[in-house]
Amino acid sequence: ATLYETVPRAVTFDPTAGYSATTVGGAIKIDGVPLSSGTGGNTTASGKLQAMVQLRDSTATTMQSQLDEIARGLISAFAETDPSGTGALPDTPGLFTWPGAPAMPADGTLVPGLAGLIKVNPAMDSTVGGSASVLRDGGAGGAGYVANASGAASYSDLLIRYSQNLDKPIAFDP
């Protein structure tokens, strides 16, 4: 295809082999001039390339950040807390964990790529030697976090708290 008049313009692209949550895409250049992206929800892009650059550099990165914040919310909602209520033990990841454990991701702070890093806590995963009863009883963070010391099968306080945590609003990094 011919861009501009009758002489084909040189369109170049600096390729990127793979994209992580923090990768900045390579520039698209026409005659050596970087192509700017469109802006806004009703895009200002005046062509398919500008719209694609906007999608890659703005829309997709916003969606990635939103997924990362949802992942942080899950880690926080299912966190184990000090069962004594004294606050002597810090909160620690419960059902969902991440590479920064035993610390919790900071509230209201974006952790780029977190959605791709969270996993089910091995303490609760029977396929790797854990037990699903740890979700009901507590203890993924160690013996100090066990809330159901008797092991009663009808104990549901933690499960109810997790459900209530999912209903709470959380602060997202803008």
Go through the PLM ranges and name each one:
Residues A1-P174:
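S/T-rich, low-complexity, solvent-exposed segments of bacterial secretion/appendage proteins
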